[in-house]
Curated annotation (Swiss-Prot):
It comes from Syntrophomonas wolfei subsp. wolfei (strain DSM 2245B / Goettingen). Involved in the biosynthesis of branched-chain amino acids (BCAA). Catalyzes an alkyl-migration followed by a ketol-acid reduction of (S)-2-acetolactate (S2AL) to yield (R)-2,3-dihydroxy-isovalerate. In the isomerase reaction, S2AL is rearranged via a Mg-dependent methyl migration to produce 3-hydroxy-3-methyl-2-ketobutyrate (HMKB). In the reductase reaction, this 2-ketoacid undergoes a metal-dependent reduction by NADPH or NADH to yield (R)-2,3-dihydroxy-isovalerate. Transmembrane segments: none annotated. It catalyses: (2R)-2,3-dihydroxy-3-methylbutanoate + NAD(+) = (2S)-2-acetolactate + NADH + H(+); (2R)-2,3-dihydroxy-3-methylbutanoate + NADP(+) = (2S)-2-acetolactate + NADPH + H(+). Mg(2+) 2 binds at residues 196, 232, 236. Keywords: Amino-acid biosynthesis, Branched-chain amino acid biosynthesis, Magnesium, Metal-binding, NADP, Oxidoreductase. Substrate binds at residue 257. Mg(2+) 1 binds at residues 196, 200. Pathway: Amino-acid biosynthesis; L-isoleucine biosynthesis; L-isoleucine from 2-oxobutanoate: step 2/4; Amino-acid biosynthesis; L-valine biosynthesis; L-valine from pyruvate: step 2/4. This is Ketol-acid reductoisomerase (NAD(P)(+)). The gene is ilvC.
């Protein structure tokens, strides 16, 4: 069974007196930095110096949160603990140019995703600790739950333990952002990276979007109205996922009709059959042997031509046009944003 840690297992004193630099102020960065500050820790934020309206707005948002913004290099030089929350595809470049030159013996490097460490894009020196604290929710929820006095579950891992206290630091960090209120599971950089990518590709993002599109297209091509197809294959998905999120698959099945449950048992395995499972296995192999990471890094090196083409192609799909029209009839959706 997985090993779990809670508030009682963590000691914030392990971070007291240290300067924590959070690199980035995006989804996770803004949440983690503010939570750490409100936990009584000394936090700074590393960003690009303002050069346009967007970067100036981000810089000012850090100031408005009562935190000192600095350039990434300045923050790295001032910090004892450096939490890198930049996009995967830019982390290595920024690390090599603006963080690595300022590392000192006994510093700690933190991450919330293991991509760059696991795939060798960032190779830390032997004289630093390397740990991961990965909240299992978007940043806005990390922040919202902390403010409510609660927290979101997370993962914790140690890749390199120079000081002999890397795990204590990781647990203190998890406590500082509120994750140990809910509980954190011990893992490894390899396990977190490979399972996270697999979940995104085969289920949460790639799997779900292709399943929804395939269902929508099947109904439309069979002569049904696109609006009806949208409701059946896209809109109602949230209702089912919310039930599973709340109480698992059994609770979802308890909550639906017997007709729907029978169709679930008998037709689901036909749709997600051996061919789909084999494709999942192949996707996992591509992740494990580094093929996916290599392809994604190369795509970024050449300016993302395929990524941008696929993004444009999917934005122009009929389901997006129909969905935008139907969501315009649902004013309550705007109230939840």
């Amino acid at each position: 069974m997985a090993r779990m840690f809670y508030d009682a297992d963590a000691n914030l004193e392990n971070l007291k007196g240290k300067t924590i630099a959070v690199m980035g102020f995006g989804s996770q960065g803004h949440a983690q930095a503010q939570n750490l500050k409100e936990s009584g820790l000394n936090v700074i934020v590393g960003l690009r110096k303002p050069f346009d309206e967007a970067s100036e707005k981000e810089w000012n948002a850090v100031i408005a949160a009562g935190i000192t913004p600095m350039s990434v290099a300045e923050a790295a030089e001032a910090a004892d603990v450096i939490q890198i929350l930049l996009p995967d595809e830019v982390q290595a470049r920024v690390y090599n140019a603006e963080i690595k030159p300022y590392l000192k013996a006994g510093n700690a490097l933190g991450f919330s995703h293991g991509f760059n460490i696991h795939f060798g894009q960032i190779v830390p020196p032997a004289f630093v600790d390397v740990f991961m604290v990965a909240p299992k929710s978007p940043g806005h929820l990390v922040r919202r739950m902390y403010v409510k006095g609660a927290g979101v579950p997370g993962l914790v891992a140690v890749q390199q333990d120079y000081s002999g206290k890397a795990k204590d630091l990781a647990l203190a960090y998890a406590c500082g952002i509120g994750c140990t209120r809910a509980g954190v599971i011990e893992t490894s950089f390899q396990e977190e990276t490979e399972t996270d990518l697999f979940g995104e590709q085969c289920v949460l993002c790639g799997g779900v979007t292709e399943l929804v599109k395939a269902g929508f297209e099947t109904l439309v091509e069979a002569g049904y109205q696109p609006e009806i197809a949208y409701f059946e294959c896209m809109h109602e998905l949230k209702l089912i996922v919310d039930l599973m999120y709340e109480g698992g698959m059994s609770y979802m099945r308890y909550s639906i009709s017997d007709t729907a449950e029978w169709g679930d048992y008998t037709k689901g395995p036909e749709i997600i059959g051996e061919e789909a499972r084999y494709a999942m296995y192949e996707a996992l192999q591509d992740i494990q042997d580094g093929s996916f990471a290599k392809g994604w890094l190369l795509e970024n090196m050449v300016g993302r031509p395929r990524f941008n083409a696929l993004k444009r192609q999917n934005r122009e799909h009929l389901i997006e046009e129909v969905g935008a029209e139907l969501r315009g009839m649902m004013p309550w959706l705007k109230e939840t944003k």
